[in-house]
Amino acid sequence: MKEKGFVDSMALRKNLWQTVLHGEFDGYLVYPRRLCTTKVDLKKLRPMIYERIEKRANEYPVRAMVPVAVEVLKARNVLIQGVSALLQSFPVMACKFCPEIFIDEKGHLIRTCHGYKRHAKNRCHEWVAGGLDDILVPVETYHLNNMFQGVIKHNQRFDFDRISAIDELCWQAGVDPCGNIVSGNSQGSEFLSPYDLTFVANRTLTAWETLRSGVLKLLFVYPAKVCKYCSEVHVGPSGHKARLCGVFNYESWRGAHFWTKAEVDDLVPPKIVWRRRPQDPPILVDEGKGYYGRVPAILDLCAKAGALVPAKYNSMMKAQGLSGPAFCR
């Protein structure tokens, strides 16, 4: 009996080890632990890493992305011209103390203003006349000599020019943006006919979509960074070291930027605004802010001029939604 028990125990151990070696035990995968460690000599790897970085720099700019950059610059120019023309017929109001804007002759009464330096909360806006920069928010970045140059230090922050982030992205893609800069007032001050307004609005909205899709394609190839705590953008594989984050009293972070991956909205801010629909009151009130639509400013401006809005924005526009809590009773 003892010999039989010993044989059964040895057979059980043998089956258990075979199960472990095959990597499966009770439905779970079991991986044997490594019994040795691999030592890496960083002194030998450092020259290889530097050589790989130099070879990578020779691969840029990517030829296939040059037409995309050209298309982005053309779309940006058409967008500036179109918005400048539409603003002659549709005024924009901007808050005096916060970034809020509203496309109408009068502002709204929605209490979302945080005041100067964020010292207030949920107060009414104080409206003044807005302009092109309130709709197309300018985003600037440092202009690099080449894509893989050294990191800009704090004491070098005045040695580099500040240009548009779109221009810098297209310049790194192999296109010189200097010949594509246009003036925002190139359309003149003449008012357009309703037919011309609709044509300009459709062309402007198409340019907006082309610009954003082109920037998205470029960001897949050319890296860009944005600070987690402020709106600073850097086009390049790594951010700069200029300690400019938190220079305002209401910002919690002080010193160097905390860089994360930049998205399309960081380089081309959509500037979300409240949209007044036909069923809404003449002046939007605070009680109905949960019912009003919230759309990009470009979309609202072009829709007022008669442009066809893409279906993907229907949920943001709330075109068939209720006007306020009074209609829910």
List the predicted regions and their residue ranges.
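Cys/His-rich zinc-coordinating modules
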Residues: 4-9, 13, 19-73, 77-85, ...
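Structured beta-strand/turn binding interfaces of compact recognition modules in eukaryotic regulators
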Residues: 98-101, 114-116, 230-233, 246-248
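Short, basic interhelical loop/turn and adjoining N-cap
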Residues: 104, 236
